[in-house]
Amino acid sequence: MSAGEPGAWGVDRLVLLAPIEPATTGNGLAMRAELFRCAAAVELDVETVVVPVAGRLVAADSSVTIVAVDAERARSGALALAADPAWSDRLALASPLPLPARLASPGLVDEVACAVDSSGTVAVHVVRAYMAPLGIALGERLGARWTTLDLDDDDAAFASAFGDLDAARAYERLLGVFGPEFHGLCAASADEAVSIGRRHRLAVDSLPNAVRVRGLPASRPVRAVSRETSLLFVSNLTYQPNVEAAEQLVGTILPALRDRLAGRVSVTLVGPHAGRLEHLRADDVEVTGFVPSLESFYASATVVVAPIRHGAGTRIKLLEAFAYGVPVVASSAAANGLEVVDGRHLLLADNCDEAVAAIEAILAEEGLAPRLIDEAGRLVRARYSFEVVAPAVRDFFARADARARSGQRATID
């Protein structure tokens, strides 16, 4: 590449705009942002800017630029944007925006743009739908060659399932207005990508979550028979569906197992919880908060249990358990979107009785745990490893560049 010539995908640098710092562990959204950051960094420099509407990590990366959420500056900036007829129309059609989109308001574009190196040719990748208005504003302000959006989940469908119809309609409006402005969109689930694409006539790629498997053993030694059963739940424990799952695990599943098993049964809850799980602490219940490394927790776990009843965000944690070689018992909601087969890669359980029976089966049935571990490990290496998914992310960016070159967006005629 000669001096002054753009690099990969027609740009010198990628600006990644996210609602949380990218990280290798601790939070599913942070891990997904890290996937895109690392995939792009193979080809060019990546500058990460975070407007932390999805929270802050304890062990934050000092190279990440944080732009604080400021309601007053956001309001004044939005008024300035509204003076532009195109933005006035966009905001009128999309309003009221979902709450996270109001916090990460497009009115913050001046502050975000000032935090970014504006030299050379740039592209902008945006993480989550609620960051889309700010992402489009930033792309226009920087003169970005192309912009992409990782939806991750179907926010409208999730809000509707949760009974929040106002939020569901807000996300539909947002994506209807801002989705067609992007050169590429993607989601973690193939089914959700298809559903979103059909509803909004958008070309939405499926890019699954991924975990690092390099350096991990191809299989975990079979644990010696023990009179202690250690149940592990790893997640963002500030997220309400995960809080409810932790409460069900400790309050319902744990007592039922104690009544049926002879040895000690314990639960370890790992992940940031902002004090919301203090009431669950007990002699046989450990609440760790954020930890920088999960290796020791997976090494000592008998079974990973994810009794999510609704919501999203646990799927990447199931992949992590697969990669570490721990048998998994999970609800259908927790495994939604993963190409898993009940009884082959994990055991599905959608209520307390099913969860208890599944855990008992893993403990009692000879060969079941090693078989689940082996099949899940094969799956994660073939479908959900960084080594497999990162090239697909780079192909996604290449398609966005190709659309930009031909004057197209990610829309379906």
Label the model's feature ranges.
Residues L368-R383, V389-D395:
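A short, well-ordered alpha-helix in the C-terminal region of glycosyltransferases
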Residues D191, N209-A210:
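Carbohydrate-associated surface elements
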Residues M1-D70, S118-S119:
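N-terminal subdomain of nucleotide-sugar transferases
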Residues L35-C38, P106, D110-C114, D154-A156, ...:
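Membrane-proximal helix-turn-helix segments that form the acceptor-binding/catalytic region
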Residues S296-G313, Y324-P327:
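Acidic donor-binding loop of glycosyltransferase active sites
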